[in-house]
Amino acid sequence: MARRPQRPAPSGRAGAGRGAAGAAPPGPDARLVVLGEFGRAHGLQGEVRLKSYTAEPMAIGGYGPLLASDGRVVELTALRPAAGTPDILVARVAGVAGRSAAEGLNRLTLSVPRDRLGAPEDEDEFFTADLVGLAAVDAAGTRLGTIRAVPNYGGGDLLEIEPEGGGRPALLPFTRLFVPKVEIAAGRVTIAPPEDLFAPPGPPPEGEG
């Protein structure tokens, strides 16, 4: 069973850098797992909206220093839920004061090294991040490609698969219908893709483009 990173949710303050027992900033060669993404500035005091990808949204505050996609190390100093959307938070960030500075965070993703997540509690569980780099094979064991990412655009997890031999990556829903078997230890997942999964996009309908 796949799961997303989860820790006991802090209350009120995120405590980054303290709640993680002084965890060091991620190294440049670490295998990274994306935990969230900043959105637009919130108000005038330097707060910013944050979409959390952890199983419990507030748990993103318990991982210590986070690596932003622009290379900076980010410390979340306070978190609170935003109104109306459970996975959207309002965050305060160390060193960010005022709306202009908060706007500079928009669209930056926040990551941690995979080894900071530890192991899932149950033997048959795994993190979606563990799928990255695995071979995608068919029922006969023929390698069809390699999993490069596990994005989620709001409709469920997807496998981004780079076809064997190169070519344009394709997205496959990460459901039992299309992914009947996951073998982390063997380094592969068995997929049952539609025939046109790796087909190049066709020409636009006549009259368009």
Swiss-Prot record:
Source organism (scientific name): Methylobacterium sp. (strain 4-46)
Keyword tags: Chaperone, Cytoplasm, Ribosome biogenesis, rRNA processing
Residues of the PRC barrel domain: 123-197
Entry's Gene Ontology molecular function annotations: ribosome binding
InterPro entries: PRC_barrel-like_sf, PRC_RimM, RimM, RimM_N, RimM_N_sf, Transl_B-barrel_sf
Subcellular location, record wording: Cytoplasm
Region (Disordered): 1-28
Assembly: Binds ribosomal protein uS19.
Biological process annotations from GO: ribosomal small subunit biogenesis; rRNA processing
Top-level taxonomic group: Bacteria
Similarity annotation: Belongs to the RimM family.
Protein name: Ribosome maturation factor RimM
Gene assigned in the entry: rimM
Gene Ontology CC terms, in alphabetical order: cytoplasm; ribosome
Entry text on domains: The PRC barrel domain binds ribosomal protein uS19.
